[in-house]
Amino acid sequence: MCGSPNTTVGNGTRALILVGGYGTRLRPLTLSTPKPLVEFANKPILLHQLEALVDAGCRQVILAVSYRAEQMEKELKVEADKLGVELIFSHETEPLGTAGPLALAKSILSASPEPFFVLNSDVICDFPFKQLVQFHRNHGKEGTIVVTKVEEPSKYGVVLYDEDGCIKNFIEKPQEFVSNKINAGIYIFNPSVLERIEVKPTSIEKEVFPAMAEQQELYAMDLTGFWMDIGQPKDFLTGMCLYLSSLRQKQSPKLYTGPGVVGNVLVDPTATIGEGCRIGPNVTIGPDVIIEDGVCIKRATILKGAIVRSHSWLDSCIVGWRSTVGRWVRIEGITVLGEDVIVKDELYVNGGQVLPHKSIAASVPEPQIIM
């Protein structure tokens, strides 16, 4: 492994990803697939994180799981082998919150004196793992959390810290402006932090961080670039737009430039797009997708094996695996079609959440769950 010890994690460094919950906010997609395996920009959400960790030199990743672990193990093992990273599944018999999983994996996390990463599985950003190691080693304290700037801090808990990054206080959903920096769900800790946590349901944000901050053992590092918690459909689509914009800034060759494309678009090489289509801005089209002639798609994700019939118009939606959108259909308003959904010809769907294996034969003019 190359790189100076300040910028690349050491051989003994590992990461823990909080996979945990049921993914209820991203239903109906998570009724078919565990949330970490849902494709974001044509790649499972978790794979974005694993690749960034491996790129920073991490060779062992613990997945703290409590739900559908077998499916995740089976699918992720192939990807892990390709990346050359060891995946360890730490099974919770009861939900342990955001701190308990660290205690459950204590024997692995404390096997080396090196610091370890912890991250929430819903986060997508330009992962700053190398910079985080350097910042953490420079201040020499027990923990560092990554913070990011948001437009509406009153929806979140904000972080107050001094010019060196030493955290002074946390304020939950402030009514008056005190800061626009929030916890980005990415951390690095020394193993000594494990002495603060027991194997029981515990919130790291509410029960561990305040005590660390009081002892001046917790620092904040500013994230540059985009960030989004993509755990629900609206934010999933916003995160997709930010991610595609980031690819554009990096002049990524992954962006698609075929006929009828407007703005930032990803298209899997196995997808087919018909004549006279307008695709984009902000669209991802997955493997084996068929887009027929005269289709207009913007701000949307079309997952593997889906079919969009001719002259349909899709905006702000996610089309699930192997779903079929009929001819002359209009879909908008953060509609999510689950797996294997059929939308019949000439319908209007506005904000529908359609459960898997359903066939829709009537328009859905108002947001609702279709069961």
Swiss-Prot record:
Species the sequence originates in: Drosophila pseudoobscura pseudoobscura (Fruit fly)
Cofactor remark from the record: Coordinates binding with substrate and required for enzymatic activity.
Function of the protein: Catalytic subunit of the GMPPA-GMPPB mannose-1-phosphate guanylyltransferase complex. Catalyzes the formation of GDP-mannose, an essential precursor of glycan moieties of glycoproteins and glycolipids. Can catalyze the reverse reaction in vitro. Together with GMPPA regulates GDP-alpha-D-mannose levels.
EC number(s) on file: 2.7.7.13
Catalytic activity: alpha-D-mannose 1-phosphate + GTP + H(+) = GDP-alpha-D-mannose + diphosphate
GO BP terms: GDP-mannose biosynthetic process
Source species, domain of life: Eukaryota
Pathway in which the depicted protein is active: Nucleotide-sugar biosynthesis; GDP-alpha-D-mannose biosynthesis; GDP-alpha-D-mannose from alpha-D-mannose 1-phosphate (GTP route): step 1/1
Positions annotated to bind Mg(2+): 122, 229
UniProtKB keywords: GTP-binding, Magnesium, Metal-binding, Nucleotide-binding, Nucleotidyltransferase, Transferase
UniProt protein name: Mannose-1-phosphate guanylyltransferase catalytic subunit beta
Family in the record: Belongs to the transferase hexapeptide repeat family.
Oligomeric and partner information: Component of the GMPPA-GMPPB mannose-1-phosphate guanylyltransferase complex composed of 4 Gmppa subunits and 8 Gmppb subunits; the complex is organized into three layers, a central layer made up of 2 Gmppa dimers sandwiched between two layers each made up of 2 Gmppb dimers. Gmppb catalytic activity is reduced when part of the complex and binding of GDP-alpha-D-Mannose by Gmppa induces allosteric feedback inhibition of Gmppb.
